[in-house]
Swiss-Prot record:
Membrane topology, from the record: Peripheral membrane protein
Designated gene of the protein: ycf3
Entry similarity comment: Belongs to the Ycf3 family.
Localization terms from the record: Plastid, Chloroplast thylakoid membrane
Pfam families in the cross-refs: TPR_1 (PF00515)
Main location: plastid
Organism: Acorus calamus var. americanus (American sweet flag)
HAMAP family referenced in this protein's UniProt entry, alphabetically: Ycf3 (MF_00439)
Protein name listed in UniProt: Photosystem I assembly protein Ycf3
Amino acid sequence: MPRSRINANFIDKTSTIVANILLRIIPTTSGEKEAFTYYRDGMSAQSEGNYAEALQNYYEATRPEIDPYDRSYILYNIGLIHTSNGEHTKALEYYFRALERNPFLPQAFNNMAVICHYRGEQAIRQGDSEIAEAWSDQAAEYWKQAIALTPGNYIEAQNWLKITRRFE
């Protein structure tokens, strides 16, 4: 049984009903409908912390999805799960792939910056200041891109950029 049919939450049920109605009345291809169903089920599983199931649904959603904008969000969510699982290299790969299709995803730039900042902090703890500086510089570049897209957001990142004299 598809995940969308077993949600117990009223809001989830309502959203599922509305989404199903929209899928029936808006002209879409069977591939688009299939991709959306997998994407919706992936989001539901992800919100419940069922990351393996969410990944499976997202990977399935990428097969029929051809729209670059919609595909970017699928790839972004795959990146989120890899980040949550501590698989930072994989996460960065999926954020890059999402940004290739949709360069206006400030949250992807932010998440990439957070990973780079984390790796910089790890390098500091390991006593490698040169590597730490390189990771921090990369984090700064990603945060600058996120801030450029949404200037009122990422206040902590803006403060970090100012404190570290990386803000231009």
